[in-house]
Amino acid sequence: MIHKSHKIIGLLVLITSCTDAKVEDVATTESTAVSSMENYKNKTLQIYTTARDTELRLTKTSAHTFSDKVQPLETEIAVFVNPEKTFQEYLGIGGAITDASSEVFSTLNDTQQNKLLQSLYGKDGIGYNIIRTSIHSSDFGLGSHTYIEEGDADLKTFSIEKDKEKRLPFIKRAIDLIGDDLVFYASPWSPPAFMKSNNNMLQGGKLLPEFRQAWANYYVKFIKAYEEEGIPVWGLTIQNEPMAVQRWESCIYTAEEERDFLKNYLGPTLEKEGLGDKNIVVWDHNRDLITDRANTIFEDPEASKYAWGIGFHWYETWTGGLPKYDNLKNIYESFPSKNLLFTEGCQEGFATEKLQFWPNAERYGNSMINDFNSGVVGWTDWNILLDERGGPNHVENFCFAPIHANTKTGELIYTPTYYYIGHFSKFIKPGAVRVSTTTSRTTIESTSFKNKDGKIVTVVMNTTDTKIAYKLIVGNSETDLEIEPRAMQSIIY
């Protein structure tokens, strides 16, 4: 019995020792984990603000300092940033230089042209680095055109002379200001009429099977012609809005048709022509059907190998409901090797009295915050510049742009949208990574990126009519801030 008792006591000592060791290990691990988070105490934050009913427009409004974090209460509003949790790398932000933008730009005098360029692309502007353009015409221009004579399937008459008149000079001046961070891509709205089932560049129709190779060759001609002009083409989308029959240039592809055109024609043709490094973006339509397109193309290895990622627009709400940001998150999680790129968005239905209409800007802010938080790497606005009517547009589809020019007076009109976009594009730099950011209330929205220099940019939007006091909690540090009613902030630290 005595020997048995000794064994029991010895076993208890061993168990106690092991338990103590595990508790000590856990405590050590937790301590190490906490200490690994960067402490922002005493670091200074710079805040830039744009707010309705004020003169604040990307204005440096205040500087604050971090202190030690205190447990937030349920009654307090807070933004939580965890710089240790990183996500997608940021490609950039920009907009489209269309024929319409180029027409309007050409009416401005030298001073106003330079002002516009600096506003968008200059060091003191909002830092655009992405440019989208159309492969021949879209609705935003004076009319429809292609780069060949009608019926020329061999593309012997291919020429970009029309683009050299106004579009290319505008693009080149923008590129000179952007420099090495340039991302330039192009999208077709429609093949030439003779290549289509409806023999019309407008009103939808489909690419005829017998012209698939000729159409793939057309992309090659475009890329080579632009690069001969000194414009490095980063990539292209296969078709603008491939499920929309529009009264302007449009062409329909089902998911299977786009997949097969990519894997059997466009992808192999680009590779054969030494252009395999160009980034091909599929879909280029709304968030509603994006998952079907991604599943169909990315689950096919022979098609997927040619696709850099998937592009999308924001117009799915035309049928009712709210933006489908959850679809983007699904793709981000389902296909982590593919990229999400916002390729177009604008406020439709131009009206002069709404040039300073604040909800237009808030639509941009809401989309950009939620798109980035869903895994999007880059964001491309539609026309960077339009005239006093929201055009020119050859089918009268007049819309808003961040900047409008009065072609009669030469005045440049900066809308709230310009400033809201700038809260992202001016401070977040290509190569930044998104970091974990959440809010404790729906009254404010937020996202954050960490630039390569280590600086974090947190963007906060308030769409209510009330000033909001909130805590910005970053790791183990916090600071007390306020945001004006109907306002956007960029916080740099």
Task: Locate predicted features.
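Short, conserved phosphate-binding/catalytic loop or strand-edge motifs used
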Residues: Q239-V245
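Residues that line or immediately flank small-molecule/substrate-binding pockets and catalytic motifs
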Residues: I97, I135, N240, H313-W314, ...
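C-terminal motif of bacterial Sec signal peptides marking the signal peptidase cleavage site
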Residues: T16-S17
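Short, low-complexity, disordered segments immediately C-terminal to signal peptides
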Residues: K22-M37
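N-terminal catalytic cores of secreted or lumenal carbohydrate-active enzymes
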Residues: T59-V233, T254, N264
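Sec-dependent signal peptide recognition
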Residues: H3-L11
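Substrate-binding and catalytic surfaces of secreted/luminal carbohydrate-active proteins
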Residues: V34-K60, V70-I77, F184-A186, N217-K224, ...
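Short alpha-helical "patches" and their helix-cap loops
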Residues: T29, N109-S119, A432-I444
